[in-house]
Amino acid sequence: MDLSKLNPPQREAVITTEGPLLVLAGAGSGKTRVITHRIVHILNERPGGALARNILAVTFTNKAATEMKERLVKMAGPRAQGVLVCTFHAFGAEMLREDIHRLGWPRKFAIADMGDQLALIRRAMRDHKVDDRAFDARKVLTLISKAKNSGLEPQLSPEGMGDDYDLITHLVYPNYQLALKAQGSVDFDDLLLLPARLLREHEDLNEKYTRRFRYLLVDEFQDTNMAQMNLLRLLAGKVRNVCAVGDDDQAIYSWRGAEVRNILEFDSHFPGSREVRLEQNYRSMQVVLDAANAVIAKNPERKAKRMWTDRLGGERIKVVTCPNEEEEARFVAHEIQKQMALGISADDIAVLYRTNGQSRPVEEMLREKGIAYEVVGGSEFFDRREVKDVIAYFKVIANPRDEVSLLRIVNVPARGIGDVTMERLHAHARADGVSLWAAMGRSQGYEDLPAGAAEKVGEFLQLIERYRGLFEEGKLAQVTRQLLEEIGFREATRALAPSLTAADKKLKSVDHVLNSLESFEKREGPKASLLTYLNRLSLDTRQEEEEVPGGHRRVTLMTVHASKGLEYRLVFFIGMEEELMPHKGMQGEPQNLEEERRLCYVGITRAKELLYLSRAAIRVKRGKEVPCTPSRFLEDLPPEAVEKVDLAAPRTGAPTDQERNFFANLKDRFKPKGAGGGAGPTPADRKV
């Protein structure tokens, strides 16, 4: 196999096949090429020729495993089919299918789904006289999962120290595990925990697996948890031909149980290991890498490395300060429009943010400008259930004959108007030739409708009519708050959410709707009305069905977490403020702040050529304008790599070219249709 196209560190990583090896693969350094070349090299060059079945390559997603296997077959031919490429969990499941009976489970076991797990957790809580209405079973399950990912068996789980949930978890975990076993089930985390127990407790199995897998490769090693590390050490046996490929600077999944110390302390787990550093970047311009290097260098707990590239020059990074989040979104949309006109394809542009809730203003501005986009790693803001419910209330208040919206919210929150009642009213509407709303107004006269149901329908009609009058008086956001309070929308949303975290996210989405209304009212002034707001949000069906210019290319919107492993010519990293980046929930412990810095590094290194880091000077939080402090990470950027653009500063002189171009283009927003230079077709948005 020709290794001449590999750089020296890459070649060293490929040909170092014996003994433990840590490959520190920086962002864009070609790690996938190194892994595939290394496997093929082992197949070709080892004395006597290694068999494909002696190689185990572990990835973190099934998609990555499939893609790697395809590359191997393309490079080495059919013999590469014998290489086992899979996730840790898939490997564990295969082990258990053969030998789980040795642990007392039936040979044909089931993997419990979330519903099964929660039912068993609640039963175990009741066994210990724990009120499953007072304590969230999902949180207990999360803590048990965390214990399993740390490699802790039930008898080893730490006892709670003053925290009720820790104590409950300590009590419930053993009962939960026994209940799983009694019904012949395992959970997802057991796919790591139980195989390790098999290898520890059964010497013949240990010998079987260590004899078969002579070469182990683990991709994305920085994302491993302790349960995976324990399994890997057992599989490595005495031969210890372990190649771990990863980047501690991209360790951003501690909330999933990933343990960055696995990569930082690799040599303590595998003494005498060698280390190869891949520092040449094939993705980004040097100016982008200079910024990334400067940010990540401030982390004390890391493997020292400095990314470099042959791609010198390039435009400086734009650090943009905007008056507020709406103007930040408008700036992003304008710059996207400008760069697309200069030839950058929409699918080579990404907007990154720390939390999903930040997408709303950007989505609105992209819709307004007719720029097609897709939201990755979560539903689009206006597709979220709680948001659609609020918007449906607006639609019914603005137009009671909107039957789809009416059916959506007539019993949301629950008010005793069930499906049977609505089916009967629908039948009467068809028979009388009137709208469903009109039929609801006649509910007292329908004999097949119980008096109680008719009364509930009447109360709902009165609610809608009353709020129609209130909305016509203006103050849209204020009236919406009053409506949501009266119907108990927040309480119902919180009660129906699967977890406390999910409830918080849903309520934040509701707050974003209110912020959107307030921004709309400020912008439109006396012209603001519920109907004009809805018209702005709505997409014309005909335009949705039209082909977006350039085929189906779309700008990508996603969290920084979701962007890992991806790359774009143009990247906008928005919300570069304290409490967002770094996130307010991660600023307490030093290790949390270090992870936020790594997250910032990941976001920066997604950019190949152009990078914008933007922030808002003011954000609306719970109906109030709050000043925002610039992210501390902006202070770490090298001055020579940065061009600052301040759109929020008071005007004291002539505007910069950047500002002049930005504000000059705002007039496009106010052009009447048909005046030329419009925004183009409305996007056909979709969820990925």
Task: Enumerate the language-model features and the residues they cover.
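Helicase P-loop NTPase motor core
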Residues: S29-I35, I100, P271-R274, E279-A372, ...
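Conserved helicase/translocase P-loop NTPase motor core
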Residues: F88-F91, L167-Y215, N225-L231, L557, ...
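P-loop NTPase Walker
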Residues: M1-A112, Q183, N206-E207, R261, ...
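Acidic, low-complexity intrinsically disordered tails
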Residues: M1, E640-V688
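Conserved coupling/interface region of RecA-like P-loop/ASCE motor cores
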Residues: N62, P106, R123-R126, V140, ...
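ATP-hydrolysis module of ASCE/P-loop NTPase motor domains
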Residues: T17, A80-V83, H101-D190, F213, ...
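Conserved helicase C-terminal RecA-like lobe
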Residues: G162, S345, S359-I371, R384, ...
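Conserved phosphoryl-transfer catalytic core
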Residues: T59, M75-A76, G82, L235-G257, ...
